[in-house]
């Protein structure tokens, strides 16, 4: 199975249900007044961090995800039901981008952290909502607000808590299979592992994911070999195991083998070499390994402690693992404390009372003269209210005209050269201009 760490999806939130015009019709109540209910809110789409997810594989074939629409309002002041929101569980370390602008919409790092990415539309108001002391029998209603429609790219930047890095055939696959349930393919050739292999262990009721990440070669930071596909996966690991083979058949120059990995990390991103890195020398049971170990120790000049193991025979693997996990818990505690200080657990956009996303609509308009007596007009404010106010009742026509007056619509058309009788198209409607 291919490892999926990036995918593109279209998210379509639900539209709000329409409000209605209705009247109270009861015996002995000659002037019952309005009784039209509001429409329900459309369903929104959320991404939720889930530590049980490890890949975006389950989204591979989901090109479009839709939320349901809110229900229409009903008679007797009955409101339409709100549609249920859609919650999509994704692995921790998932970053959500706007596919068009490349803007980061969500960076998900905490278990059960929720992000609203596509907001459902507000339900339209029924005529009861518009009743006032000045208008006791309003023939006013609204259509539901359109739900958001957005194409997003999901990229998994954190696939594991602990990453195992090293040159091809350092023994990473053998190591991870020695203490986890991972079953990687092993063989003596370059890039045996073409996708990250994940293995899991449990300590103190905590699940810890290890990743055998495909081997680095010189020039990986420029994209050579598996290049960036490898490096991006170690950016957010809590710590790294730098595995190096002591077998002279793998590395005739042990210092060069060590420095290749260190230099590639530095060239890609300096912060990588500042991570906790545990240097583990593997294949100590091979002929010539002790000589290579001594050369490596002299090169490092006691600046870095080396843990010596044989992954194949399981020599010293458990002791090495205990030390690594202790460092992991220390790093995780520091990381979680920083998140609590700087990030809210939930980032929730509140429903607005009358406009989408609780923001002020841009009232700027653009007027295009198509010919001598035909104009098209565009603008966020116009687009929103053209959809919300159906021009099917006299009261709605008056309300829509009030919206136009609030932005000096007629004055701007006159300045653009419009005269009485000209046709004015505003998105889906066409009006006759009156000075």
UniProtKB/Swiss-Prot annotation:
Keywords: Cytoplasm, GTP-binding, Hydrolase, Magnesium, Metal-binding, Nucleotide-binding
One Pfam family this sequence matches: DUF1967
Domain of life: Bacteria
Claim: Protease is one of the keywords in the record: no
Chain ranges of the Obg domain: 1-159
Main subcellular location: cytoplasm
Start and end residues of each OCT domain: 355-435
UniProt-annotated binding residues for GTP: 166-173, 191-195, 212-215, 282-285, 310-312
EC number: 3.6.5.-
Cofactor (UniProt): Mg(2+)
Entry GO MF terms: GTP binding; GTPase activity; magnesium ion binding
Gene Ontology biological-process entries: ribosome biogenesis
Domain annotation OBG-type G: ranges: 160-329
Entry binding sites for Mg(2+): 173, 193
Disulfide bonds: none
Compartments it resides in: Cytoplasm
Family: Belongs to the TRAFAC class OBG-HflX-like GTPase superfamily. OBG GTPase family.
Function per UniProt: An essential GTPase which binds GTP, GDP and possibly (p)ppGpp with moderate affinity, with high nucleotide exchange rates and a fairly low GTP hydrolysis rate. Plays a role in control of the cell cycle, stress response, ribosome biogenesis and in those bacteria that undergo differentiation, in morphogenesis control.
Record-linked PANTHER family: DEVELOPMENTALLY REGULATED GTP-BINDING PROTEIN-RELATED, MITOCHONDRIAL RIBOSOME-ASSOCIATED GTPASE 2
Subunit structure: Monomer.
HAMAP family in the record: GTPase_Obg
Protein name, as recorded: GTPase Obg
Lineage: Bacteria, Bacillati, Mycoplasmatota, Mycoplasmoidales, Mycoplasmoidaceae
